């Protein structure tokens, strides 16, 4: 929810232009995820040149976003390029978006590494890939609330970013088979149960 002043200059994403009887109608958005990609293109020469590629964006506009980036050139640090010296580049984008928090993580072809990175700033102990595009992510007990995030935001954005259904657990809540203790197996498939105590774990898809 933003408030605009007359004469205020804003960067927006053009969704589409339609011809109407009264003339062209331009549909604009400040919440569209691709707006962040375009803002970084303006701020980061490595992005505009293609040396750094934005692989995925997950956004809850006005609150927080996660961006996965990768380098196409040896020796180019994708995260460092996005952040800029003393954080100048990412700060410029944050200011344009009214203070929206932005997490920049490194994309990885290996799903286990990518999933671990996506839950930053939490530290991940282990990622266990499960059937049907699900992943069980194990984090230390003291990192559990950080991995899940306030109202589940961190794990929710990580799921959107990666396209995986993520179940976050502490080591104490994972059995030797790598299954969350709030789950059960029926007919060879894992059926999730809603955890009664959010502090024990959290999932998002």
Regions found by a protein language model. Name each.
Residues 1-205:
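RNA-contacting regions in translation and RNA-metabolism proteins
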């Amino acid at each position: 929810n933003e408030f605009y002043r007359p004469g205020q200059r804003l960067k927006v994403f053009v969704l589409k232009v339609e011809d109407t009887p009264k003339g062209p109608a331009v549909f604009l958005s400040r919440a569209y995820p691709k707006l962040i990609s375009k803002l970084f293109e303006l701020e980061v020469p490595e992005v505009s040149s293609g040396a750094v590629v934005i692989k995925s964006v997950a956004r809850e506009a006005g609150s927080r976003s996660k961006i996965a980036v990768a380098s196409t050139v040896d020796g180019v640090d994708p995260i460092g390029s996005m952040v800029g010296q003393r954080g100048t580049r990412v700060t410029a984008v944050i200011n344009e978006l009214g203070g929206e928090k932005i997490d920049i993580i490194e994309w990885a072809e290996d799903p286990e590494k990518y999933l671990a990175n996506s839950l930053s700033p939490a530290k991940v102990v282990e990622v266990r890939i499960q059937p049907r595009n699900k992943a069980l992510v194990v984090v230390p007990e003291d990192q559990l609330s950080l991995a899940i995030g306030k109202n589940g935001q961190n794990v929710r954005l990580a799921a959107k970013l990666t396209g995986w259904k993520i179940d976050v657990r502490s080591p104490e809540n994972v059995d030797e088979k790598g299954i969350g203790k709030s789950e059960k197996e029926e007919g060879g498939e894992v059926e999730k149960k809603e955890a009664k105590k959010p502090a024990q774990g959290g999932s998002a898809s």
